[in-house]
Amino acid sequence: RQRQMCIRDSYTATLFADGINANKQAEDYRTEKLIIDKNSRIKLHLASGGGFAMKLELYPVRGEVTSIPEGKNIPSFYKKYIETEGLYVTSSERVSDEALLKACDIISLMLSKRPDVKAHMVKKGCHVMVIGKDEETCDLPEFAHICNSPDSIAYWNWRARGFGGAPEDEFSASCGEENLLALPQDKYMGENILIHEFAHLIHMVGIAGVEPDFNDRLEALWKSAGEKGLWAGTYALSNKEEYFAECVQSFFNCNRYADPANGVHNSMNRRVKLKAYDPEMYKLLKEYFYE
């Protein structure tokens, strides 16, 4: 299976250095953070016996928060906008810039390994809406068709603070500002809802759009996991779509912990656990996401 891989332009480099005593623990070293690219050169001057180490992390690709650009077919409810290589995040003026920056960084890094998947999602118009911490889900215009009565408004405002694809738009995902920023009123504490909801778009729009056999592969893994007794009593067994999104959360160390399983979650909430518990799914996810 041939895939286009991505060589990133920029990285965050954390340099750990000590010019005198190399026997120190790394966390005790002098540290410095740099933004570098593949052509950068770093000069180090170390005394005899000195030591250093470097950690490289992908640097998100994004612009700055602006008003809605002219020519964009975006509802007038939205006043803020930020973009990462064609994918955009938007919100009303009541949402902090910090939340939009965080959302943009997340989607940039999630797609950093597969530019072909990202390009297809850009072509389809994929985007993210952030629900303000003081806004209700039904305030967003995309939800008007399901928030069309007092009962439905009350239900959806209670039911969820984020969706991936349906019911609003198969090319959009949404999440709450309070979850992005881990604010006290977050009802999903311990999880990152954007990673879950955006994983649905990556799956259903991006990957399936460039790999027509992907859903067959995913369904086979989902059925096999169920037959092995994996994910019993969790949301991941609902269908192949939730299996993918829940496992992506665990891959990125942002799923909620429950032991025993509580009908939604179990104890497999982190990457190292997922790798040991469901190695075939872990292997699949590595095709699309950096470890």
Regions found by a protein language model. Give the residues of each.
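N-terminal low-complexity, Pro/Thr/Ser-rich intrinsically disordered segments
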Residues: 61-85
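Pan-zinc metallopeptidase signature
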Residues: 248-291
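Acidic/His-rich structured neighborhood in mature extracellular/periplasmic domains
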Residues: 74-77, 84-87, 92, 96-223, ...
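Post-HExxH zinc-binding segment in Zn-dependent metallohydrolases
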Residues: 205-257
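Active-site rim elements
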Residues: 91-94, 230-238, 268-274
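Solvent-exposed beta-strand/loop surfaces of large extracellular or lumenal domains
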Residues: 15-39
